[in-house]
Amino acid sequence: QVAGNQTNKGVAIICQSGTIGNTISFNHRSLPIGYIISLGNQAKLSIEDTIEYTLKDKRVTAIGIYAEGFTSIDKLIRVFKISKEKKIPIAIVKVGRSKVASETILTHTGSLSGKENIYDALFKRMGVARCETLSELTELLKYFHTHGVISNDQISIMGPSGGDMAMLGDAAETLNLKFGKIKPQIKNDLKKVNHPGVIVSNPFDMQTYNWNDPDNIEKTFKIFFKNNFSSISLMLDFPNMEKCDTDEWDAIVDKFIKVAKKYKNGSLISSLSDTMPKHIRDKCINNGISPLQGMK
């Protein structure tokens, strides 16, 4: 079976495995998918040919690839250059780092996986994001779909939990992302609309003093978005909707979306993939906000 919904624009998925293509279509992550193309052993069409084809479609916002091997490095470099020129980002899961994976690839599609350090260098040079798992791939494609590539490495994150902020600090460091410095005037303005016990920093532990104060929550978001960072995110985990009332969480997300959609660099992050319900993910996507499930 093939799962999914029609979309006016979305990402193109190119796979050397039909099952993996299907698996991506089964996602519970609200990823807008325009194409799923399975190539197998590339006897007729190569990954490079298919990238070139999808780059010609103006509805394609980003390209996600599962690859076991390539047919032409020269052609691969050429289509990567085209993607950069068109500002259509590419994310890839390239398997074959281990001996076991290399042997499996040989029996699966007959591909030679090649030296992975060479691919690492190539992807980095061409601005292609290498992912290790399908979860990483789908989450990154959501970000690419809504925002494209970040303009710099300066980010900011806010949320009601100091523990979440600490974990995100570690996660950001592994990705070579930096928490930008909040300007003094913005810091002073944030202090005016938050409880004296709240320490303004980046990442910003907002705590829950304003949890039921929608006006000050909205003011906090408006002030925080004045920071000139490439990405500004709110971290929030929803309880189980079957057992709990989520009206308070919905209200906070609505305030965040109201502010963030004007700036086109906002994301909503949940620490677990399960703690962001579908109606919230869809609302974010429809308003240009990236709903990111999980810290990586």
Feature map (PLM): residue ranges:
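Catalytic-core regions of core metabolic enzymes
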Residues: 1-296
